[in-house]
């Protein structure tokens, strides 16, 4: 293994050790010379350690000089990866080493965007203190404050506002942070933004204000808060609708009712502080109720002059009102009210029934009637038996069975109901927070499962494609090898047959040469007879020129080897040729005796089976060769040389005809064998093709079953 391969292996091991947080292995690999490698997503060991929260590994990598600002395939740095999980210790280490704070990923998000989106307020605080740009926008035009408001992260929103983020900045859709908080019904964030003097009259690209958005989505509490903050209900959006018309269009009757009472809500918000002070005074002026037996005991000792009547209380109240300055002088007014409290609220014990007049009761009733208890008060009144008795009171029976009296306009259930309402609201908020966290976890798990499933599907697709390609190439190689083997076998058969035919032809030629050489020797022996045998030798050609019987006998006497040679040659050729040449062997059997009777028969009788033009020509040549003998006078005797030449030419013609017939039969046999080989090869190819298609179909079915299993 070369040095580069060794370094690459060490780098891969460094990635694994950084991912698992193996500090000792990281130190050893760095000392051995491992360099910074990246994963298939472009992430370095610093990315992996920062995301997994391995602080010691991050510190070692920083000391080793690892680049802080390397971006992966999603353009995220190690700071992004640490911010996503909210690891403040690693964030502190990276910031201390001087990493870039405002690097943007492929969506334009900085590390501050990630911290605000996930609600890691401590991470956001660290980044803001380190000098991160709080006004940076992503590709959608959202700042970090937009993302914090969208996910209802109040603490992150507060930190960003304190860090200098502007609540009136708009994204690409023209929405401010107030639009976003109103859209997602985050009441606490809306209040934070209103306390930060965020404008309630800003419009987005559709011309909607935050009040339009809340009215369209039926967010009653947000609408109420916006109205109390002074939102204008007459602003018209691009569709020509006011917030009231928008609420009616979306069938939100409760919000529409709030918007119709908008002036009353504004007056209520302006006079809320005054009402609180009045309620406080009302509570302090009320007398405490006492048990009925104590009231009965005190009736005899109390005179009518000691009890202030309603006529005396009304002038005192009017004097107190005259002494009160305008609403602008609130401190003096509070001081004067505190001074006048003992005079107004100093009620004595109830007077006897005989001393109470109807007029006094009416005046007291009219005097105390406007002082009703507010429904939305959160104070908890003392038990009814702790009050002093009013002139008008109601009776009730306590837990111990005693008859008690209480103010006629009071309600003991109201503080309990208010307490239950507060507890219910707190429980609802907790449940919402829990649901949000559970939803985030479920979404994260589903995202992980989806990514894992997609990765597995990609791997399976690649494996199936590779397997199919390998099977296809293997089948093609097998087909090619089979075709090549068939071709080689055919060529070998053809070469063997050609060699056999050549050998047979050479044997025939050699036999002919031997026969011709034997005939020439006999001719030479006959051409030099003794003088006493000259007369019979001259008479033999004359006898041969006679009738056909004489020619037959002369031919059998002169050449006894011709028939034997032809018969043996034909027999040997019949044994050497394949069984398909039976017709050729029969033809040779016909031709062999024809060679012995060539002087007696004409050209048409030489090759009757073949019926070729050459046979006709051979007959003509034979006829022409016999004409001189027939036309020659009986007194002339042909020479022995002319007869030998004629016999040799006839033998050559017969041999030529024989070879032509044999070659024609061999060509037919070759063509038939080639056709058989082709048909067999085509059948085998079709069978292999059908087998291959069946195999491919089974593989596709297996792939479909795997996909359905993975999707389930």
Curated annotation (Swiss-Prot):
Keyword Repeat: yes
Biased composition (Basic residues): 362-378, 614-625
InterPro entries: Ankyrin_rpt, Ankyrin_rpt-contain_sf
ANK repeats: 9-38, 41-70, 74-103, 107-136, 140-169, 173-202, 206-235, 239-268
Biological processes annotated in GO: negative regulation of canonical Wnt signaling pathway; positive regulation of Wnt signaling pathway, planar cell polarity pathway
Keyword Repeat: yes
Polar residues composition bias: residue spans: 298-313, 598-613
Spans annotated as Disordered: 277-382, 521-647
Amino acid composition bias (Basic and acidic residues), ranges on this chain: 280-296, 316-334
Cellular component annotations (GO), alphabetically ordered: cytoplasm; nucleus
Annotated keywords: ANK repeat, Coiled coil, Repeat
UniProt biased composition (Low complexity): 536-556, 626-643
Coiled-coil residue spans: 416-445, 669-712
Described purpose of this protein according to its UniProt entry: Recruits CKI-epsilon to the beta-catenin degradation complex that consists of AXN1 or AXN2 and GSK3-beta and allows efficient phosphorylation of beta-catenin, thereby inhibiting beta-catenin/Tcf signals.
Assembly: Interacts with AXN1, AXN2 and CSNK1E/CKI-epsilon.
Protein name (record): Ankyrin repeat domain-containing protein 6
Organism in which the protein naturally occurs: Mus musculus (Mouse)
Biological classification of the source: Eukaryota, Metazoa, Chordata, Craniata, Vertebrata
Gene field: Ankrd6
């Amino acid at each position: 293994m070369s040095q580069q391969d060794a370094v690459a292996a060490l780098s891969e091991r460094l990635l694994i050790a950084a991912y698992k947080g193996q500090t000792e292995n990281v130190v050893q690999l760095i000392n051995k010379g491992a360099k910074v490698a990246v994963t298939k997503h472009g992430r370095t060991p610093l990315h992996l350690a920062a995301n997994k929260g391995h602080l010691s590994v991050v510190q070692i990598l920083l000391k080793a000089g690892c680049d802080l600002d390397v971006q992966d395939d999603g353009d995220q740095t190690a700071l992004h990866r640490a911010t996503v999980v909210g690891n403040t210790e690693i964030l502190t280490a990276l910031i201390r080493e001087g990493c870039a704070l405002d690097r943007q990923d492929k969506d334009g998000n900085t590390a501050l965007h990630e911290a605000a989106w996930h609600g890691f307020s401590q991470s956001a605080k660290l980044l803001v203190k380190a000098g991160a740009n709080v006004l940076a926008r992503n590709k959608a035009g959202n700042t970090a404050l937009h993302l914090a408001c969208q996910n209802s992260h109040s603490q992150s929103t507060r930190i960003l506002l304190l860090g200098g983020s502007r609540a009136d900045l708009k994204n690409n859709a023209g929405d401010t942070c107030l639009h976003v908080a109103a859209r997602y019904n985050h009441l606490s964030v809306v209040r934070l933004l209103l306390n930060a003097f965020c404008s309630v009259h800003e419009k987005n690209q559709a011309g909607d204000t935050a009040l339009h958005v809340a009215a369209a989505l039926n967010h009653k509490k947000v609408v109420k808060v916006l109205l109390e903050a002074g939102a204008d209900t007459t602003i018209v959006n691009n569709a020509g609708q006011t917030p009231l018309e928008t609420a009616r269009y979306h069938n939100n009757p409760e919000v529409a009712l709030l918007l119709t009472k908008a002036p009353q809500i504004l007056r209520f918000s302006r006079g809320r502080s005054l009402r609180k002070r009045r309620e406080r005074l009302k509570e302090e002026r009320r007398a405490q109720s006492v048990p009925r037996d104590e009231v009965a005991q005190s009736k005899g000792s109390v005179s009518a002059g000691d009890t202030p009547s309603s006529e005396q209380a009304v002038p005192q109240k009017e004097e107190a009102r005259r002494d009160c300055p305008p609403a602008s002088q609130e401190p003096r007014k509070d001081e004067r009210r505190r001074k006048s409290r003992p005079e107004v609220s100093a009620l004595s014990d109830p007077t006897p029934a005989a001393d109470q007049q109807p007029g006094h009761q009416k005046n007291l009733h009219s005097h105390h009637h406007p002082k009703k208890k507010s429904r939305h008060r959160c104070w908890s009144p003392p038990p009814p038996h702790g009050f002093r008795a009013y002139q008008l009171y109601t009776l009730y029976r306590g837990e111990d069975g005693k008859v008690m009296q209480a103010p006629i306009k009071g309600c003991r259930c109201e503080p309990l109901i208010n307490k239950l309402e507060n507890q219910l609201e707190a429980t609802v908020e907790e449940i919402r927070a829990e649901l949000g966290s559970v939803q985030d976890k479920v979404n994260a798990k589903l995202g992980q499962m989806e990514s894992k499933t997609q990765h597995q599907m990609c791997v399976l697709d690649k494996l199936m494609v590779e397997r199919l390609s390998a099977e296809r190439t293997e089948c093609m190689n097998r087909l090619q090898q089979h075709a090549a083997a068939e071709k080689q076998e055919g060529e070998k058969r053809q070469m063997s047959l050609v060699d056999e035919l050549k050998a047979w032809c050479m044997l025939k030629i050699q036999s002919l040469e031997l026969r011709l050489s034997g005939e020439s020797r006999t001719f030479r022996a006959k051409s030099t007879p003794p003088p006493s045998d000259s007369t019979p030798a001259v008479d033999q050609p004359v006898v041969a020129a006679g009738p056909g019987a004489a020619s037959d006998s002369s031919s059998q006497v002169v050449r006894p080897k011709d028939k034997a040679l032809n018969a043996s040659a034909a027999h040997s050729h019949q044994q050497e040729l394949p069984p398909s040449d039976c017709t050729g062997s029969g033809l040779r059997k016909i031709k062999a005796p024809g060679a012995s009777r060539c002087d007696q028969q004409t050209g048409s009788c030489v090759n009757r089976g073949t019926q070729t033009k050459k046979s006709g020509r051979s007959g003509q040549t034979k006829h022409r060769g016999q004409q001189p003998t027939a036309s020659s006078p009986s007194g002339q005797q042909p020479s022995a040389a002319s007869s030998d030449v004629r016999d040799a030419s006839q033998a050559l013609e017969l041999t030529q005809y024989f070879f032509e017939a044999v070659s024609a039969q061999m060509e037919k046999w070759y063509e038939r064998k080639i056709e058989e080989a082709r048909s067999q090869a085509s059948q085998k190819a079709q069978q292999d093709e059908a087998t291959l298609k069946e195999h491919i179909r089974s593989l596709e079915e297996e792939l479909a079953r795997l996909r359905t299993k993975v999707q389930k």
